[in-house]
A protein has these predicted regions:
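Compositionally biased alpha-helical segments
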Residues: 1-375
Length: 375
């Protein structure tokens, strides 16, 4: 992540930005949404609609999530509030919510390799951009690898234990009666042994490690950012093996690869056979193609930008089938985006008609690419 930080003293600090554990354009920024602009269509929804939190009048609070590569600027307007600008010019006011992204200090790696921390109260604005060709690469590099599960393999940037995300980060554990820490740059593979791990170094040396959450069943999960899918988080129960790979084996997007977001557009087919085409608002929440659909399959969680989704079909109260570009198919559950807790879909049809479809009445949703929208 690269950008220019303007402080309240009008200093401009340019460099690579570390935001908590977020380092890369594919990492996810999360904050709380303020209000819901789609409640103005409450009369269209009808008085018999009960939202997923059990209240009649207002839907539950939703989170805003997108990848850092979609963000143009962030302006600090309060200790827990920001104005976030996305590519294309739209600006949204957001609050801290359950996320810790708002209100914390950030670190900037300068051109000379030194780092400078900036506390939240001293930040005026952050403007993101591609790093100039003249600036050296950052000192640290991401963990690139393949994660194997019983259901398949995931190849991308890895965040271990939802914490360690760079080659200089340390994998902690115990061997025999003493503690040991190994930098990820020295690790070739990590194999789960249930409540311990077999760690193989690039040198060929094998380490049997146990006793810390990096290497046992208390691990919080292994996140993999896949360039054209989104983020996958594998729970320890489903984790089998991690293998490190060279970074150049990944086709990583750069800042300019993230296009300006567009409205969701497609067709909703209802269970009584009605076809409704137009601009969509999904779960009375997500309205742009850079926002994320959340769901789980067993111990594996998915966060998928809507721009990669092509079809969404609710199968029952608990599960939804989705199809991504690239012919990937998944069955997802647990999260309100893909269960009976979904608050329904608004369809803005040509001519100004607005139609609300309850989730229980949705048979299929087809989402179209920008090319299709312009046809």
């Amino acid at each position: 992540i690269y950008g220019e930080v303007t402080t309240v003293m009008n200093r401009k600090i340019c460099g690579y930005i570390t935001w908590g554990k977020k380092l890369y354009w594919t990492d996810i920024f999360t904050a709380g949404k303020i209000g819901n602009p789609y409640m103005r269509y409450r009369d269209i929804m009808g008085d018999n609609v009960r939202f997923s939190d059990g209240r009649r009048d207002t839907p539950p609070e939703h989170e805003f999530s997108c990848r850092f590569g979609n963000i143009r600027s962030i302006r600090v307007i309060g200790d827990r509030r920001i104005e976030l600008g996305v590519k294309g010019g739209n600006v949204t006011e957001l609050e801290r919510g359950r996320s810790l992204a708002i209100g914390n200090w950030i670190t900037v790696e300068l051109r000379d390799g030194k780092t400078e921390s900036v506390v939240w109260d001293h930040i005026s604005e952050i403007v993101f951009s591609a790093a100039p060709d003249t600036i050296p690469e950052p000192k640290d590099h991401p963990i690139a690898g393949i994660v194997e599960t019983p259901y398949g393999m995931y190849k991308g940037l890895v965040q271990w234990d939802l914490d360690e995300n760079s080659l200089d980060a340390l994998l902690d554990g115990r061997m025999e009666s003493s503690g040991i820490s190994v930098a990820f740059k020295n690790i070739g593979s990590i194999k789960s042994l249930g409540n311990s791990s077999l760690v193989t170094l690039h040198s060929g040396r094998e380490l049997y490690m146990w006793g810390e959450n990096d290497v046992n069943a208390t691990n919080r999960g292994i996140a993999i950012n896949l360039p054209s899918v989104g983020q996958v988080i594998v729970g320890w129960h489903d984790f089998k093996l991690f293998r490190s790979i060279p970074l150049d084996q990944l086709n990583l997007p750069v800042y300019d690869d993230f296009a300006a977001p567009v409205r969701l557009f497609g067709r909703v087919e209802t269970r009584n056979g009605r076809l409704l085409e137009g601009v969509l608002v999904y779960d009375l929440d997500e309205a742009m193609d850079f926002e994320l659909l959340d769901g789980q399959n067993g111990n594996i969680s998915y966060r998928i930008p809507f721009k990669y989704l092509r079809k969404i079909e609710p199968k029952n109260y608990k599960y939804t089938w989705v199809k991504l570009s690239g012919e990937i198919e998944l069955v997802l559950g647990t999260m309100c985006d893909v269960t009976a807790a979904n608050d329904g879909v608004l369809v803005f049809r040509a001519g100004g008609e607005v139609v609300y479809v309850r989730w229980r009445d949705v048979k299929r949703i087809e989402l179209w690419t920008k090319v299709k929208q312009n046809d």
